[in-house]
Amino acid sequence: MHLLYLDASGDPGWCPPHGRSRTTWYVLAGLSLEEKLWKQADQNVKDVLAKHGLQWLTDFRELRLSTMLAGAHPYETLGIARRRALVNDIFSLVVNLKPVLFYSAIDKVKHRTQYGVRAFSPHVWAFQLICPRFHKYLERIDGLGIFVMDPEETKHDAKLKELIKNARQQGIVLTSSFNPYLSNTQLPRIIESVLFVQSQDSPGIQLADFCSHAIWKHYERGMSLRYKQIAGLLDTFSGTVYGSKVWP
């Protein structure tokens, strides 16, 4: 079984004049780990926290890249050098685990301009774009998989919640009346569609947060140091990268 831990970075809202978002890009990233590596990932995260005197940090929801970089709670007592060292160790942890990386990056301005009022919400569309890429990977390796997501991701998005609910009965159906080139795919290798796990209990989701934020900064701000560090993890076959989708 392959677990795809999902986490997003960026505001899924529309930019002016259609909304109030101040950011152009929305990114959803997924880290695929074999089931047997879950305990290793959990222990590795705890080891890194202990190394930096943070073994008391048991709520993994607080293990967020943006929080560390800003020196916000609970990292306000750590100097910038210690925070950078912590971030370095976590990215090294991700690379050494050798997960398979997937992501979808949506330029919200171009997406809304191209499709107008018919444009899918970035939150929903990012999920729909990443699903078939993970499924094709599972077909290639003859494996089964499941999406793992924090329930907070769907709390304020009724359309995403509906998509996931329907997926449990009929799969992730990628079809649209205004885009006939989308596939009608039920993704039979995905088991139970989405498993919801509180992120404070899942180091996998929080490691996905580090990746999604690094990818978002690459597109939104042109800051690519961390992106380059993890780009080698992208699903690749015969020299072609299949793990990423930039839209439109």
Task: Give the label of every model feature segment.
Residues 1-248:
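Phosphate-ester processing/binding pockets and catalytic centers
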